[in-house]
């Protein structure tokens, strides 16, 4: 899984490890990734393999899939967790930030799915009662536009669409994909908004972890293309 060193990804990795999954975890920053791997293997007792990789570098993305395949030869759950977001009015968004968000949030996810699909199909064929899953951390901004998050929202809309394409092409073979679409979750990523939204009013990492875990338990007869998780009251449907 990508984006596993912090935040939501780390929470999902912890829970999957406790559920008995062997894990390949990835992020860019090696020291923090190594610490996450040590903490995860202490908690779970299972195999945890850290692979430092930058999702803007295609060779890193391919190396990540290869490293997992060589070690395990199967892939039950691919979690697309790595993501970046920058807030700016549409008119003032730089092309550099546009490219970075699309590279990490969409291109890397596409390449990961493309390269992992044969392994996911093989795993699903060998375990037809469970199948194999792709879980993408998308965003509510991919469903409803949010001021100042035009590019981020567009990347997450593309990720939701990528999950739908996986379902269209591979769910008959037991490989299904779910895009989880939350509003603001209390992590490092939302530090910039804490002055106007208190962390206690944000969705909890554990709320998203529960959704991800539920998806892993579904039979291949049930495809859940997306799950929207919104904050309550006046914030319904908003980030
Ligand atoms: N927090 C929210 O409110 C929220 C809401 C909706 C959706 N999401 C989505 O959920 C996912 C996780 O968000 P989070 O809040 O947990 O974020 P976070 O705490 O900022 O963690 C982001 C993770 O992605 C990794 N990452 C970032 N850029 C990367 C790159 N270029 N290559 C490889 N790894 C990279 C980070 O590790 P390194 O920095 O070491 O690379 C880290 O492990 C993201 O896709 C985000 O868009 C978050």
Model-derived regions, located:
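Active-site helix of classical SDR
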Residues: 113, 155
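Residue(s) in the substrate-gating loop at a strand-loop-helix junction
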Residues: 139
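Conserved glycine-rich cofactor-binding loop
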Residues: 5-7
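Active-site loop immediately N-terminal to the catalytic Tyr-X3-Lys motif
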Residues: 91, 144-150, 201
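Conserved glycine-rich Rossmann-like NAD(P)H-binding loop of the short-chain dehydrogenase/reductase
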Residues: 19-36
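C-terminal helical subdomain
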Residues: 172, 179-180, 187, 195-237
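Substrate-binding pocket helix/loop in short-chain dehydrogenase/reductase
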Residues: 89-90, 94-99
């Amino acid at each position: 899984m990508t984006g596993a060193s912090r935040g939501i990804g780390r929470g999902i990795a912890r829970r999957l490890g406790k559920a008995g999954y062997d894990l390949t975890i990835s992020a860019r920053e090696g020291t923090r990734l190594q610490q996450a791997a040590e903490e995860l293997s202490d908690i779970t007792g299972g195999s945890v393999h850290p692979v430092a990789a930058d999702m803007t570098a295609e060779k890193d993305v391919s190396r990540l899939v290869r490293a997992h395949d060589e070690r395990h030869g199967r892939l039950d759950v691919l979690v697309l967790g790595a993501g970046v977001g920058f807030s700016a009015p549409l008119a003032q968004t730089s092309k550099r930030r546009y490219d970075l968000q699309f590279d990490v949030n969409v291109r890397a996810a596409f390449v990961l799915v493309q390269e992992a699909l044969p392994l996911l199909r093989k795993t699903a064929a060998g375990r037809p009662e469970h199948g194999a899953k792709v879980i993408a951390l998308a965003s509510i901004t991919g469903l409803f536009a949010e001021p100042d998050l035009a590019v981020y929202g567009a990347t997450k809309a593309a990720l939701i669409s990528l999950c739908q394409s996986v379902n269209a092409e591979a769910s008959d073979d037991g490989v299904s994909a779910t895009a989880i679409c939350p509003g603001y979750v209390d992590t490092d990523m939302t530090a910039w908004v804490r002055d106007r939204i208190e962390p206690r009013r944000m969705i909890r990492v554990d709320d998203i972890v529960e959704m991800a875990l539920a998806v892993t338990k579904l039979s291949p007869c049930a495809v859940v293309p997306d799950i929207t998780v919104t904050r309550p009251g006046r914030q319904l449907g908003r980030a």
